[in-house]
Structure formats: structure tokens, C-alpha cells
């Protein structure tokens, strides 16, 4: 069964220490954390390192580096530095810079900064960004030409951008250190309606098997046993389970049940 990580988006109203506790309570194999460099302190780094050590959970990823036309690269690099100090395996990046050559240049700069840190720089595509499709993302990464570059697949963004599992299967496995996973309704928001796109991404995701995304095909298209960050941003889930640990437990159980079912179907 694929290792599963509690993505920070499942518990967005909670800080990193509570997120780690929730990942433990939910029976996850790893955890992801949201990093805010302007308010992140050395004491918080020490506290998070201690909490991770006590939990025994690896830190699958930290997020988010959001590349913009006037990006403060020093702040982005600090996000990487914090991730490296915490032992993160990946840092998640998105871009709202319409100049894709500039995005590639900044990603390359971040990859160089990450050298020796044991961390990959993963670009996520989606219609809410300027890297809207898997093809655009691959073109950016081809321009980066650095071994630490990576591509982050999220089924909802694959579907909403009009891509398919076949497009995912065509990605070189070396570019896929991990993936996000969730389900979602069949109805796609109008890609020109930014608010609808954002609501779809942060409020309307669903437990695996409860929506209409082709998750079995998507899982088969990904490298075998790839770690899955369960990115279940759901208003309904937040309202039904205001406690972070309970929310993580429900999500972890549903995820493992679906993965067991997927394994049976594949055998």
C-alpha cells in the first residue's frame, strides 16, 4: 500500500504542532507542514523538530513557495532552509507569473539553493495558477534542467485542467517523488471564474471514492508505491470534524479503506 501523508490542507486552521499530532492520531505514515517564513521563529523550528522526532513521522513536504512577478527570492529560499532543517523531502511551489521563462529561472535558482539539503523542488500545476496544465509544467521543468526539480500531481488539478491519467503516465518517474491525492465532484468549475476555481480546490474536495475523479486510473498512472499526500481540503469535513485529530482519523481511515479496495481490484 502507498505510504500516506497528512497534507497541511486537511487541517488548514491549525499550526504545525497540531498538524503533527493530527497525523499521528490519524495513523498516517508521514506529514506535511505549512510554512510562513515571516512569522516562523527559531523556537518554532526547535519545537517542530522535537515534535517530529517524538512522532516518528517523516516530513514529506513543506509548502508553499508562491512564485510571483515580484517574488522575494530570499523569503522563498528561507522556506527551503526551514524545510531542510526540519528534514522535509520536498517543497511545494506554484507560480502566478505569466512569464513561464521567469518561472523556470526562479525554479532553477531554488533548485540550486536546495542542493545538498536532501529536498526536491516540486512544481504544482493547476488552472488557479499561471502553470495551468501538465504540459506547461513539463515545459517549465524541461527548461529548469536541474536534478532536484520535480512535478507534483494532484488529481483534482489534472481533471480540472482537462488532462487524463494517460498524461500522468507519460511523465518520467524520476520527476515524481510524491503526489497529492483526493476525490472531487464531477462538475468542473468554469476555468475563467477564479473564485469558483478556488472554492472547488479548497472547499469541495471529497474522501477517496466519494467523488467522480478517475482515481483508480490515476493511481495506476503514478509510480508504484509513490507516497501520497492526502490533500483533502473540504469545508464539509472541517465543519463535521472541528477537532484536528478526529478529522485526521476519519480521513486516514477512509484513505486506507479505499487503497485496500484499489489493491484488491488491481490483483
Q: Which residues are covered by each model-predicted region?
A:
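Acidic-and-aromatic substrate-binding clefts and catalytic sites of carbohydrate-active enzymes
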Residues: 9-16, 33-44, 66-74, 96-103, ...
Amino acid at each position: 500500500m502507498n505510504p500516506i501523508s497528512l497534507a497541511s490542507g486537511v487541517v488548514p486552521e491549525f499550526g504545525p504542532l497540531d498538524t503533527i499530532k493530527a497525523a499521528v492520531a490519524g495513523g498516517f505514515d508521514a506529514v506535511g507542514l505549512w510554512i510562513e517564513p515571516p512569522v516562523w521563529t527559531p523556537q518554532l523550528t526547535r519545537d517542530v523538530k522535537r515534535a517530529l522526532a517524538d512522532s516518528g513521522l517523516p516530513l514529506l513536504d513543506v509548502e508553499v513557495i508562491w512564485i510571483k512577478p515580484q517574488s522575494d527570492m530570499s523569503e522563498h529560499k528561507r522556506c527551503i532552509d526551514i524545510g531542510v532543517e526540519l528534514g522535509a523531502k520536498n517543497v511545494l511551489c506554484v507560480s502566478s507569473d505569466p512569464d513561464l521563462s521567469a518561472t523556470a529561472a526562479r525554479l532553477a535558482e531554488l533548485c540550486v539553493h536546495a542542493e545538498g539539503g536532501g529536498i526536491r523542488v516540486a512544481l504544482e500545476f493547476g488552472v488557479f495558477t499561471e502553470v495551468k496544465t501538465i504540459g506547461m509544467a513539463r515545459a517549465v521543468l524541461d527548461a529548469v534542467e536541474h536534478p532536484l526539480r520535480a512535478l507534483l500531481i494532484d488529481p483534482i488539478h489534472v481533471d480540472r485542467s482537462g488532462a487524463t491519467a494517460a498524461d500522468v503516465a507519460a511523465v518520467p518517474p524520476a520527476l515524481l517523488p510524491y503526489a497529492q491525492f483526493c476525490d472531487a465532484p464531477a462538475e468542473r468549475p468554469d476555468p475563467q471564474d477564479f473564485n469558483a476555481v478556488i472554492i472547488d480546490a479548497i472547499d469541495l474536495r471529497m474522501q477517496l471514492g466519494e467523488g467522480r475523479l478517475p482515481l483508480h486510473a490515476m493511481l495506476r498512472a503514478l509510480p508504484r508505491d509513490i507516497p501520497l499526500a492526502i490533500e483533502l481540503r473540504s469545508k464539509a469535513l472541517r465543519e463535521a470534524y472541528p477537532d484536528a485529530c478526529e478529522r485526521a482519523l476519519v480521513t486516514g481511515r477512509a484513505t486506507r479503506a479505499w487503497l485496500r479496495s484499489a489493491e484488491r481490484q488491481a490483483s
